[in-house]
Amino acid sequence: MSYFDYGYFKYSNKNIKKFDPKKERTKLSDKRGIINRIKANEFDKEFYDGDRINGYGGFKYDGRWKVFLKKIIHKYKLNKNSKVLDIGCKKGFFLKDLQDMIPGISIYGLEDHKYPIKNSMKEIKSHIEFIESFTSINFKKKHFDFVHAHNSIYIYNLRDIIKIIKKIEHISKRSHITIPAYITDTERLKFLKWTLTGTTILNEDEWKKMFKYIGYKGDYYFSGAKSFGL
């Protein structure tokens, strides 16, 4: 188990300055209320492609995963014979870029909301499966060479997150989880003010203790207030 930052948030913060600077995110944090959180937690059009105050404000493909998939491919030694699962794949952007970079690789996506699947990329849609809950994931032991879960499981409660991480450990040879965390109370409050869908937010030491306790041996990255530029 190791901490691995493949650069997603560094790239995102650098390339979205022109339309979503830190001060704009702070303004959104100040404006977001319970109705915005209700709309966001439907994980429907309003969250993905509606107003920015309710979610992404337009979840569109931009090819950004190709920038840091190079690191992922190298670290996890992925090739055309590999099987890769993306948990919480949304519209399939990670899978699309991975397929483009390694033609012939076996890609699988699981998504627990129907809107992003319906609006996923046509060349990827057949590779995405709807699942009511990631706690129901059911594959054979070490079925996948690599399992990826990018900020997709923290919307669950702690008990379910433990179930999901145990399943990730069971079905993967190697894995990487990105999950929100904080160090200081100030970071925690900033993130809670910003997030629309966050349910389980622990500090970094708590996540590490939990990983060790449940036997998770995969890699991880902690996102949070600093990652989002708050």
Regions found by a protein language model. Give the residues of each.
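Class I (Rossmann-like) S-adenosyl-L-methionine-dependent methyltransferase catalytic domain
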Residues: M1-Y76, L85-F139, Y156-K167, R174-L230
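Phosphate-coordination loops involved in phosphoryl transfer and adenosine-cofactor binding
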Residues: N81
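Conserved acidic residues
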Residues: D145, K173
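A conserved beta-strand element that flanks and buttresses the S-adenosyl-L-methionine
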Residues: H148
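Short catalytic micro-motifs in class I SAM-dependent methyltransferases
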Residues: N151-I155
